[in-house]
Amino acid sequence: MKKYYIGPIIEYDENGNVIYVKIHDGYESWYEYDEKRNCIHAKNSKGKEQWNEYDKNGNRIHTKDSNGYEEWNEYDENGNCIHYKNSDGYEERKRYDENGDMHYI
């Protein structure tokens, strides 16, 4: 018997956000959003989960997954990421010049 792959099954909420995906091998993902349409929680059929927090401008400032891995971001007044760090100890700082070009510090 032949199997034909016709694409994933995707469901959307009333705002057009993807809330469910199932691909041909049975892998599934579910997504939840806040009132600003930011993805605040995602989980999949393999038991992994991720939680996200955002600032008032919709920039992701914190992410944590079900394995305990975390990331933090800080932004300037223009929405540019100026500081990133993660729970593995990696950290980077950046600045942006008057042309908007990024430079590592």
Feature roles, as predicted:
Residues 8-105:
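A detector of tandem-repeat and repeat-rich interaction/domain scaffolds
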